[in-house]
């Protein structure tokens, strides 16, 4: 089959009679068409996030402002409470000090009222007892003498104590010298001769001098005197008969 033939129209550009200036004006008037910039999905997400963040930031800032306002109000209230507490403490202290001072004054007044009648009672008692001032002074002197007499008595007692101690000390006793008496042996004894008796009677001059120089000593006989035996008695009788 044969293709159908298309109608072709011949265009005469001369009919338009356009000049080059028209092309220039056309170029000036109509610029290139502006292309729309497609935004990428990342940028869109970032924008959304930034928007959310901005909203959150604004909310946080608002919350912070509210908190700061609350804190300021609390601090103001706390300061006022502290001031009130200080005032109340001061008032309590002042009230306590005033009460203590009042109690002291009351006690002093009570003590003064008690002492006044006692003084009034003591005054007539002193007037009755005490005579003149001279007697009162004499009584004081007596008191001073009494104190001095006490001191003297104490001194005398102290002096008498060592004397008692001296009395208690025992005195040294003299040693008793005992001369044992010669005991003659028993047996037959004859008559003593005259020479023996003369020797016994006449002491030697040396013995006399010694007795004169030496003082007589106290002789305490511890043992009782010995009884003369029969032989000694016979000897004495014989000596007396010879004389």
Curated annotation (Swiss-Prot):
The keyword DNA damage applies. Phosphorylated in an ATM-dependent manner in response to DNA damage. Phosphorylated by CDK1 and casein kinase. Residues 64-77, 197-206 have a biased composition (Basic and acidic residues). Residues 1-243 are annotated as: Disordered. Residues 35-51, 149-174 have a biased composition (Basic residues). GO terms for biological process: cellular response to X-ray; chromatin organization; double-strand break repair via homologous recombination; glucose homeostasis; interstrand cross-link repair; intracellular glucose homeostasis; positive regulation of insulin receptor signaling pathway; positive regulation of transcription by RNA polymerase II. It is found in: Nucleus; Chromosome. One of its GO terms (cellular component) is chromatin. It comes from the Eukaryota. Residues 91-100 have a biased composition (Low complexity). This is Nuclear ubiquitous casein and cyclin-dependent kinase substrate 1. The lineage of its organism: Eukaryota, Metazoa, Chordata, Craniata, Vertebrata. The gene is Nucks1.
